[in-house]
Amino acid sequence: MILDTKADILVTHSFHFNNTKMHGLSGHLFEVLDYYWYFKNKGVNVKCLIPEVVTKETFNDFIKGHYSVDFDLNDMYFLDTKILAIKARNILVTDGGYWFLNQYKSKLLGNVFSFACGPSFLESEDKPEYVTFLADHKIYPGLGINYTKKVLPHLNHIPGDKPFAHITKNCRALSESQIKDLIRDYPDIVMYSDYLNIQNSTNKPIKNFNFSKYVYTPIMRHFDCSPRLIIECRILGIDFDLWNINYKDPGLERRLETDLDQFILGASDNIINYFN
């Protein structure tokens, strides 16, 4: 099956090509939605491919649990079956690493753009030349177009009374001893997780940022390409702790810079100028 969206811009991330559907809820899904909303409000014929987690039936409830603005369900593709290729005039991949973009070149039919994401951009020379990269040069010096990935600020917030952590197997998994230490330090913490089955964990996303504090936990690769929940907490005035971060992470350090405005996606953003 070839998905011909007939869109000027299709926004997606790479997980729809993964047979295992193992990634679960991640910030890349919200990046897809953020940039869809931005392009839509610029009058662009834009579509989204939602790879996993959200279905057509759960989409509206999912949106209301995060955003304070509306999204057009008719612009969303939810696919339960594998597709051979996706087609649009321009395709924006929010999480494309070199491996994915090289492996699936034949499946991306259109002008391909990708946000830089992960340490592979700093370590690999196997750059896919058919892709236009949008990369923050403070993290990825000299790669593609200098562009800082941003966060849509239109967020629903219902304050909560417990700290929160995001513990998922994709890249944020913690060892058993780390989990015990985390609960010791935050006895009433609520953890969203797709693999834990303990009293403090839930496999249901926390809606409306309903927590008192975000506890940012270590990631295995020591490189968080765009920790958006840090920015969302800063936008909403929610406290956050950096728990056991005893390593240097250029992506995290970038998001902790004082100037919050540089990370907020607004109407004046210039990303639209790079698409034809």
Task: Place the predicted regions along the sequence by residue.
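Residue-level signal for short, function-critical loop segments
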Residues: F15-F17, E52, G118, N170-C171, ...
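Conserved catalytic-core segment of nucleotide-activated headgroup transferases in glycan assembly
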Residues: K21-Y38, K42, H137, G142-K204
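A short acidic, amphipathic alpha-helical/loop segment
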Residues: Y35-Y38, N102-L108, E125-E129, S177-D185, ...
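Catalytic core of nucleotide-activated saccharide and alditol-phosphate transferases
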Residues: L73-I179, L260, I264
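Short acidic alpha-helix that forms the nucleotide-activated donor recognition element
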Residues: L84-I86, S201-S212, I235
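Short, acidic/turn-prone active-site loops that include or flank metal/cofactor-
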Residues: C117-F121, D194-I198, M220-R221, I245-N246
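Acidic donor-binding loop of glycosyltransferase active sites
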Residues: F209-H222
